[in-house]
Amino acid sequence: MKSGIYQIKNTLNNKVYVGSAKDFEKRWKRHFKDLEKGCHSSIKLQRSFNKHGNVFECSILEEIPYEKDLIIERENFWIKELNSKINGYNIADATFGDTCSTHPLKEEIIKKRSETVKAKMLKLGPDGRKALYSKPGSKNGRWNPETHKFCKCGVRIQTSAYTCSKCRNRSGENNSFFNHKHSDITKSKISEKMKGKKPSNIKKISCDGVIFDCAADAARHFKISSGLVTYRVKSDKWNWFYINA
């Protein structure tokens, strides 16, 4: 891979465009691709291409390391040496690749490039985009199995955690409200607010084939305590169990 300063020369009138590249071959291909699409960063080179067609040849002016200060200095030297701003196709001094910012048709170029990308993505479709750009798991260069941990229920959790929020044990001292009690006023407010609503963490329960929305419903039906319902669910003697638990 060669880097440095190059020129694109019109073989009909000898006018040139001076540029810099980290890889000459790749940069030249990009130039002609943009010219064919009509969205080149140099409006003067684009107009000449539109008028004369592909009568251009590329050549290396100077091979140098691709370092910003050095590249800008030598590119500006060749722009002045070949007079390519006044009698050529350069529209600005060297900018280390940023030629779009000073382009008179900047907005039009951005719009064309945006439309091209959108059309490409639309043509690929969801499956095509996933196959082409998705890099899950070990295919991703930043993937590290040590930073991925899963709870027994299958939910991804932080590496410092032992369980997900849903599976976490909140009984006894594990409960932040342990040894605390609500006041009668607070209990009354909570009761009024929760009337007609069912808790989000309720589980359906099967009691000998009869399905109930929650343990409380089963307790009311059999006229027993919720604690006894829980006991029978955990006991091997009873055909009681939570559904999808």
Curated annotation (Swiss-Prot):
First-tier enzyme category under EC: hydrolase
Cofactor(s) essential for the protein: Mg(2+)
Keyword Hydrolase: yes
UniProt-listed Gene3D superfamilies: GIY-YIG endonuclease
EC number: 3.1.-.-
Ranges where the GIY-YIG domain occurs: 1-88
One Pfam assignment: I-TevI_DNA-bd
GO cellular component: transcription repressor complex
Biological process per Gene Ontology, one example term: negative regulation of DNA-templated transcription
Keywords: Endonuclease, Hydrolase, Intron homing, Magnesium, Nuclease
GO molecular function: DNA binding; DNA-binding transcription repressor activity; double-stranded DNA endonuclease activity; endonuclease activity; sequence-specific DNA binding; zinc ion binding
Family as reported in the entry's similarity comment: To endonucleases of group I introns of fungi and phage.
Its job: This endonuclease is specific to the thymidylate synthase (td) gene splice junction and is involved in intron homing.
Name of the featured protein: Intron-associated endonuclease 1
Gene that this polypeptide is encoded by: ITEVIR
